[in-house]
Amino acid sequence: MGFSDAGIYLSDPNNLCQTELGFFHEPSLGFSDQSDPQNEFHITPPIYQELQDQDLEPKSQETNNCSRKEGATVKKEEEEEDDYCKTPTRSDQILSAMPRICPPAPRKPKRVPSRSLKVRNSYRSKRMIILNVSREIDCLFNPTSLCNKIKKARYI
């Protein structure tokens, strides 16, 4: 639920007392008994009005001094910037409107296999010799040559 009176959110630009002291002179519920639209702004008591008038004079002098100092510092900063960095204005220094195509990202080179593996693999792939050595193996383990001394193992 909102308030119908916008006066609690607005402040008079000439009234510095409420911003300095940090409080408003409105009722806490936001309703005002005033019916005049010009008096919707906050009312300052006479004590605060005197303080406000005294405070305004030094502040106006300070703001004028600050603006003069700021103007001087801005001019100095502009001069310093002109000395150091300048935007290129020649036609050969200006970047082209067409974006350049970037080269592909660098990749890790493939590992070269060692020569010893290369030699071994090349012989295997090119020369495949199939040997049948079953007869030689049978001759080595022939039961007649062992003189029937083969004993069977006993299982426990």
Curated annotation (Swiss-Prot):
Matches recorded under InterPro entries: CDK_inhibitor
UniProtKB keywords: Cell cycle, Protein kinase inhibitor
Basic and acidic residues bias: start-end ranges: 67-77
Region (Disordered), start-end ranges: 52-90
Recorded GO MF terms: protein kinase inhibitor activity
Transmembrane segments: none
Function as written in the Swiss-Prot or TrEMBL entry: Probable cyclin-dependent protein kinase (CDK) inhibitor that functions as a repressor of mitosis in the endoreduplication cell cycle.
Name this polypeptide is given: Cyclin-dependent protein kinase inhibitor SMR10
Organism: Arabidopsis thaliana
